Amino acid sequence: MTSIIDPKKYTKTVDLLRSFFLSKGFFEVHTQNRLSILAACEDPETVATYEYNGEIWPLPQTGQMWLEYELLKNPEAPGFFCVSTSYRQEPNPVEGRHEVIFPMFEFEMHGGVDELKKMEVELCEHLGLPELEIDTYDGWGNMFNAKELEHEHEEKIGYGMITDFPEFTSPFWNMSRNDDGATSRKIDVILNGMETIGSAERSTDKEKMRETFHTISDGEYANLLYKLFGKERVEKELEEFLEFDFFPRSGGGIGMQRLMQALS
């Protein structure tokens, strides 16, 4: 189910990432001791739960919400990052591509999708990776004569960047949408033929975030959270998040094992 991670490769990789973000003045956050319902991703089929101190919680899939929390509470900081563990109860894992428990390196920063793209290109240069070919989701789709990009297309991309994801790909509820209303300001970085960095500009539109929370994955995401944790708890946590004063910001998560493969 899960692979044993080589400590030497892991140390080298996490040190490269830490040094990059620390050089930009980012602060490291410990997120694993923080309980949150909204720490689940957009695919409701992969959420697993545990009971702690008399309440049911989702096994965390991301530290993103806590990094956003820190940036929104401390806007004077350049950014934040964390090393987290993601639990993905994949119903049909693809061997060699999917780990059901894996380490992630996540970051949150000021600026929109243009600043995010620039930073990720700089990060890949810092890591010594090949130059990235950049195109939109539809652009890559036209290249491969495919409406929906699959694993096989990522393998053909090799090293590249996919931008402007259509709504049918179920972008996360707090991702910023483009003015066309049909695509999101989301970027996936493909390294060694696999999606390794998933990132996006965050929304500043409270009403749009509230609406999208209830409609992503055809409403299954919100309904599953209600079923597992109760509507009152879920809505309370959502509304507490939406009380923040939002500003342009972006962030993403890096799959450590996939990055280690790309670097080896």
Predicted features and spans:
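TRNA-binding/sensing appendages of the translation machinery
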Residues: M1-T46
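Short, well-ordered alpha-helical packing segments
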Residues: V14-R18, H30, G63, S84, ...
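A translation/RNA-centric and nucleic-acid-associated enzymatic feature enriched
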Residues: E45-D114, K118-M119, L129-S264
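A generic secondary-structure signal for well-formed alpha-helical elements
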Residues: L17, F21-K24, C124-E131, S217
